[in-house]
A protein has these predicted regions:
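Surface-exposed binding/hinge segments that line
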Residues: 31, 107, 111, 116-121, ...
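Detector for C-terminal structural segments
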Residues: 40, 44-46, 55-65, 225-230, ...
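Extracellular/periplasmic solute-recognition and catalytic clefts
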Residues: 165-166, 222-233, 260-318, 337, ...
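Aromatic- and charge-enriched surface segment that lines or borders ligand/interaction sites
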Residues: 97, 102-153, 259, 268-271, ...
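N-terminal lobe/hinge region of extracytoplasmic solute-binding protein
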Residues: 37-110, 214
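Gly/Pro-rich hinge or "lid" segments in bacterial periplasmic/extracellular proteins
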Residues: 74-79, 85-93, 97, 187-258, ...
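Ligand-site clamp/hinge motif
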Residues: 135, 204-210, 238-290, 306, ...
Length: 566
């Protein structure tokens, strides 16, 4: 590979490697059949939309069983296979962990700057009654899917501005022509949140209706009950295989995958304990010891949450939060170290957002930060009161805060934050909301002055862009600084990853110091599964919040399950 490939060297976009086989390092032969019942990372939240053009963050999680993408995670690099990858990051695939999915190979070229992608031949869209006849997946499907996203009125601001055009040069070749180097090219459409390849026939039938959904993936969506379950059934004509030992096996192994939507925490924990769930992907630390005692056979994985927790303070409207002294004061008023020790019982990191510690050179630990950043994480109510008085609020003030009732951790944590703030004269009026209304408040910019949430890190560049660049959807504070925006754009265009890492570290320091959020600790989360779940090691994502390729490679040892009394 030449041109951009050479220029990018170790950058994410340039180190997309040729497809490599998925090799599971186990001597146990797989078994077909059975169903897999899962409480996913988002067990409390039902599917939000089946249409990628809605630009809904959870779309990939729910459709990634049947809409495949150009690229995906190379699961042969998983730790359980002797590799280095945990595959829990919400939307960050290191360059060495990417493989072709619908793409067979690709090559960067110059003049104009472009990437030519050769697609796998013979992959089929299955027949869907009332929607489409069975037919081959071709390059025009990629072009159609991209163009539809690019023209969507719900498109994230600037999402595809780096792309000049996308065209099919023959039946199995698609060419992306870029305006300039761009660090996230592969993520934005190759394996990102809205990157699934959708046939035109589904759009013509109505892409928002789950009954019309069909794709090239290992499963097909066969039932959906909002607030209850998503059911995916094995696609018998699926093209991919899993290599185990010296033999290749057709996947998927299970006949059915079911996502269970369970809003009550005690209920989904009980469902795991009693074997009604085979896997529960997100368990708060409070429930771990009791589960280990009552169900000692469970297997476990612990991971640092892939989203930062914070109280966003709106700076895009008149009020106390316009003054940086107020924002800094509220940070100093909250005893964050005590929250780690007492509330989380040590199961959290004081500092792990907006960059994630798993991002290597993009992450800078707190002890390396400037003193002005470090003091935001040190409890100093006296200093907080002084700053509030200097800003004109010697007696404090009050404000409303919206929080999602879907998040048990937040429902417990926010009153604790409120108690700290009350000690410096700042009172919160807490407004719990169901997830749909909570999300709508942010996307419509109708939220209150305070907005308590967690936001996915996503990847080292997007974690800054989506939260702090002007006009971005996931920017709850309304932060806007043209100079900051320009620095972010420069980072995206920088082809040298070492230089880009330094630029992102600078951007992270700057936004931490200006404190549009009350920065809070990041908890550890646990995943658990029963021993009859095979070819699995706690992996959560094979792309942007997309678990489909992981589930397709799991099998259920039904004999063992029966032997264990389930």
């Amino acid at each position: 590979m030449t041109g951009l490939r050479a220029a990018f060297a170790s950058t994410l976009a340039a180190t997309l490697l040729m497809a490599t086989p998925v090799v599971a390092q186990t001597r146990e032969a797989p078994k077909y059949g059975g169903s897999l019942e899962i409480g996913t990372v988002y067990v409390t939240i039902s599917a939000l939309s089946w249409d990628s053009a809605d630009f809904n963050w959870k779309h990939n999680h729910d459709t990634g069983q049947f809409y495949e993408q150009l690229f995906a995670a190379d699961l042969s690099k998983a730790r359980r296979n002797g590799g280095t990858q945990a595959f829990v990051l919400d939307a960050h695939l290191p360059s060495e962990a990417i493989r072709g999915e619908l793409a067979e190979s690709w090559e960067w070229k110059q003049n104009p700057l472009r990437v030519e992608i050769k697609l796998r031949k013979g992959i089929m869209f299955p027949e869907k009654a009332g929607v489409m006849k069975a037919r081959e997946f071709v390059a025009e499907d990629v072009v159609f899917s991209y163009d539809r996203l690019d023209k969507s009125p719900k498109k994230i601001l600037g999402y595809f501005d780096h792309v000049e055009k996308v065209e099919a040069t023959d039946r199995h070749t698609v060419v992306f022509t870029l305006k300039h180097p761009f660090a996230e090219w592969d993520y934005r459409f190759g394996w990102g949140y809205m990157s699934g390849i959708m046939p035109k026939e589904v759009v013509d039938a109505g892409a928002a209706n789950w009954r019309n959904a069909t794709g090239t993936g290992p499963f097909q969506l066969t039932d959906f009950v909002s607030g209850n379950s998503n059911t995916y059934t094995r696609n018998p004509a699926y093209w991919d295989k899993e290599k185990i030992g010296d033999k290749e096996y057709q996947i998927p192994f299970v006949d059915k995958v079911v996502y269970r939507t369970i809003k009550d925490e005690a209920t989904f924990v009980t469902a795991l304990r009693t074997g009604k769930l085979d896997i529960l992907e997100a368990i708060r630390w409070q429930n771990v010891e009791s589960l280990k005692k009552s169900a000692p056979q469970l297997k476990w994985n612990r991971w640092l949450a892939q989203s930062g927790t914070f109280l966003a303070m709106r700076v895009d409207q008149d009020g106390p939060f316009k003054d940086v002294r107020v924002r800094r004061a509220l940070n100093m008023a909250v005893n964050k170290a005590e929250i780690v020790k007492e509330y989380y019982s040590g199961n959290a990191e004081l500092f792990a957002y907006p960059q994630h510690p798993d991002y290597g050179g993009y992450f800078e630990p707190l002890d390396k930060m400037p003193a002005s950043v470090r003091e935001l994480f040190a409890y100093d109510p006296a200093r907080a009161k002084k700053l509030l008085a200097e800003a004109g609020y010697p007696k404090g003030f009050s404000f409303k805060v919206q929080v999602c009732s879907c998040n048990p951790d937040h429902m417990d944590l926010l009153p604790l934050v409120a108690a700290y703030l009350e000690q410096v004269g700042v009172k919160l009026e807490i407004q719990p909301m169901e997830y749909g209304a909570f999300l709508s408040a942010m996307t419509s910019r109708t939220m209150t002055a305070g907005y308590f949430m967690n936001n996915g890190h996503t990847n080292p560049t997007t974690t800054i862009r989506k939260s702090f660049v002007t006009g971005q959807t996931w920017n709850p504070s309304g932060w806007s600084d043209p100079a900051y925006d320009a620095k972010m754009e420069a980072a995206y265009r920088e082809p040298d990853e070492a230089k880009r890492e330094a630029m992102l570290r600078d951007l992270t320091r700057e936004i931490l110091d200006k404190a549009p959020y009350i920065w809070l600790p990041t908890p550890y989360v646990y995943s658990a599964w029963w021993p009859w779940v095979k070819n699995y090691g706690g992996e959560l994502r094979a792309g942007a919040v997309r678990p489909g390729p992981i589930y397709a490679r799991i099998w259920v040892d039904q004999d063992l399950k029966k032997k264990m009394g389930f």
